[in-house]
Amino acid sequence: GRDAYIADSENCTYTCALNPYCNDLCTKNGAKSGYCQWAGRYGNACWCIDLPDKVPIRISGSCR
């Protein structure tokens, strides 16, 4: 797995305010854990730890 901003099918990050929301989202997708990264590269977005390779992550390019 990898540590990354989890993305939806449109290459958009998940906006967040609280850590539990991201931890839940990340672990449901197979990650070890997750938290809300505040004021990061994509604003407030969920960051996952050890996310499986099959799950999409935010890559360069626009969020559609």
From Swiss-Prot:
Location(s), subcellular: Secreted
Biological processes, Gene Ontology terms: defense response
One example GO MF annotation: toxin activity
Disulphide linkage map: C12-C63, C16-C36, C22-C46, C26-C48
InterPro entries: LCN-type_CS_alpha_beta_dom, Scorpion_toxin-like, Scorpion_toxin-like_sf, Scorpion_toxinL, Scorpion_toxinL/defensin
LCN-type CS-alpha/beta domain ranges (all copies): 2-64
Function: This protein markedly relaxes the rat carbachol-precontracted anococcygeus muscle. This relaxation is inhibited by the inhibitor of nitric oxide (NO) synthase, N-nitro-L-arginine methyl ester (L-NAME), suggesting that the response induced by this protein is NO-mediated.
Similarity annotation: Belongs to the long (4 C-C) scorpion toxin superfamily. Sodium channel inhibitor family. Alpha subfamily.
Protein's UniProt name: Makatoxin-1
Source species: Olivierus martensii
Lineage: Eukaryota, Metazoa, Ecdysozoa, Arthropoda, Chelicerata
